[in-house]
Amino acid sequence: MTTDNSAPTASPWWSLPGKFLRREFLPVLTDLRLAIALLLIIALFSISGTVIEQGQSPAFYQANYPEHPALFGFLTWKVIQVVGLDHVYRTWWFLSLLVLFGTSLTACTFTRQLPALKTAQRWKYYEEPRQFQKLALSAELDAGSVNSLSQILQNRRYKIFQEKDDILYARKGIVGRIGPIIVHIGIVTILLGSIWGAMTGFIAQEMVPSGETFQVKNIIDAGPLAAGQFPQDWSVRVNRFWIDYTPKGGIDQFYSDMSVLDNQGKEVDHKKIFVNQPLRYHGVTFYQTDWGISGVRVRLNKSPIFQLPMALLNTNGQGRIWGTWIPTKPDLSEGVSLLAKDLQGMVLIYDAQGKLVDTVRAGMSTQVNGVTLKVLDVVGSTGLQIKADPGIPIVYTGFGILMLGVVMSYFSHSQIWALQKGDRLYVGGKTNRAQVAFEQEVLEILERLSSQSATASNQQS
């Protein structure tokens, strides 16, 4: 007598994590409800990043989001900076949401979409009439032939598979099964582009006077891998900045004439920019976003022309005014203040007691404290927002793939089987979408088949 002592072999310990991932984690990761929840959360924080100004100074948030009263009862500058809502698209938790969403889509593609495509490509002939009973749409005809049906289906762009004269399988719209996979690829590409842009892009701001040359230095927000995007071997010169005003004195548009210079100071690009018409060079985009007054050019008596810097004054929200002070005596014991609110050339002159002495325009002179003061020009400065986002081409590519996948998904994957048994013709079909349209198409095919059979019978008789 022999005894069977065989027992189930225990799985090695290193295979346990893989089994756990497949049985417990993977079903959760591929759950449609998780993908929808992640998409809604990402959309919510994306909206917050649009509503809440990004990349501003702490003073800006303290002024616009005070603790008392808090916006919506909870949104203060402290909350914004602690959570990272001032640079939401670069926070670790937002990037983690993108990675998790992309991982969910990728897992869904491999565990559901690709198997569904493989299943759609695997088919078999129906060789028994009872097989047609499980189809949602089927018919039994006492006239017609498989060959006649084959010709009708070919005219309707079906791909025909036929090994015997009495058996047929036809399909069209297999591209509709590929469409969801392409959609997932497009979305994942968009997510990768967004992550790459957040990691390698930067935002800078510069206020540059007319005639000045600058390099991008004032970085206000940058990804951890953005150092390689900072311009090193070229600079930008603001040739001229000016503002067009409406007849009523309001600002119509402001312009900057800009040149890109290489290391030798040679102009390699040139463009006049204004709002919504930026300058782009080597992946860096310069937007016209603001303006200011950087200085005023004056002359006292017959002295050389000199330029005084003008500073933005605190007006408690009553508009923007720039001012400077100019001495009228060598020992600096007396002087006057010059104020300007725009680039139309109007300058207000105040004495030490704050009394308005005179109002002059650019090119005019006036007598103050016994000297002749001539205002030659008010020098403007252009406010530029500078961005670099290497992920944008990837995002655009992803959107192109996404739109292609959406179009492909509109095609219905329709399948038709046919079997000739004696004088009986069995026809059945199914589709994955647009069921009503498919039923109408099958009815038209059967009517066409019946009319051909009737015509053939009349000709024989």
Curated annotation (Swiss-Prot):
InterPro entries: Cyt_c_bgen_Ccs1/CcsB/ResB, ResB-like_domain. Its main location: membrane. It comes from the Bacteria. It is a multi-pass membrane protein. The keyword Nucleotide-binding does not apply. Keywords: Cytochrome c-type biogenesis, Membrane, Thylakoid, Transmembrane, Transmembrane helix. GO terms for biological process: cytochrome complex assembly. One of its GO terms (cellular component) is plasma membrane-derived thylakoid membrane. The chain crosses the membrane at residues 32-52, 91-111, 178-198. It is found in: Cellular thylakoid membrane. May interact with CcsA. Required during biogenesis of c-type cytochromes (cytochrome c6 and cytochrome f) at the step of heme attachment. Belongs to the Ccs1/CcsB family. This is Cytochrome c biogenesis protein CcsB. It comes from Trichormus variabilis (strain ATCC 29413 / PCC 7937).
